[in-house]
């Protein structure tokens, strides 16, 4: 059975999707941008955006009864691959030394 997760401390969904869904002990989260849920504004700069996106994910997971340590796989979309090191620094602050599997892609027109 599927359980829909709605998180009041993450930005409202911008389309027809849920913050997360849980089934059989697994939680599947939707992607998060670096949008501050209090203001609805995108954080300025790639480090601030990465930080806010990870805060949003953490809040969704907490609502679902999980933590960042429960994450098995992440996917990062960057507009500019030159931001890779800056995002890695912020990412490392949230995961310590127990990193989940990860993919990272450069995308245009994000």
Where are each of the predicted segments found?
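Short, polar/acidic, helix-capping and beta-turn segments at strand->helix junctions
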Residues: 1-110
């Amino acid at each position: 059975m599927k359980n829909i997760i709605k998180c009041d401390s993450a930005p409202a969904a911008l389309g027809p999707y849920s913050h997360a869904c849980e089934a059989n002990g697994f939680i599947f989260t939707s992607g998060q941008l670096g949008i501050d849920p209090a203001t609805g504004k995108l954080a300025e700069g790639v480090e601030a955006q990465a930080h806010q996106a990870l805060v949003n994910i953490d809040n969704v997971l907490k609502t679902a009864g999980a933590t960042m340590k429960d994450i098995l796989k992440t996917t990062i979309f960057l507009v500019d691959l030159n931001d890779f090191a800056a995002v890695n620094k912020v990412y490392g602050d949230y995961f310590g030394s127990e990193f989940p599997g990860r993919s990272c892609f450069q995308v245009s027109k994000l």
